[in-house]
């Protein structure tokens, strides 16, 4: 199992969350088995997203999807702030 943590800034959390929630079916189809969203206690527009996948290949493939990049842009993600980190279950 691989878990991806993505720290990033968004222009407006509420607008971002609507787009994120509307992408749930694509997440499942892309291999996401579990997800969670966290907000910074000091900056409500800084979010940490956790997605779990069955394999590293699924995780990398999901993050390369053009529709994911498009959804991120539509949601107001500051793509320059993206910090994906991949972790394997120990």
Positions of predicted regions on the chain:
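Short S/T/G/P-rich N-terminal loop/turn motif that feeds into the first structured element of a domain
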Residues: 1-70, 74-90
């Amino acid at each position: 199992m691989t878990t991806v943590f993505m720290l990033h800034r968004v222009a407006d959390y509420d607008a971002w969350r609507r787009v994120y929630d509307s992408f749930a079916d694509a997440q499942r189809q892309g291999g996401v088995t579990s997800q969670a969203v966290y907000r910074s206690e000091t900056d409500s527009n800084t979010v940490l997203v956790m997605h779990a996948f069955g394999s590293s290949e699924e995780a990398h493939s999901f993050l390369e999807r053009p529709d994911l990049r498009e959804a991120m842009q539509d949601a107001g993600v500051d793509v320059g702030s993206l910090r994906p980190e991949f972790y394997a279950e120990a």
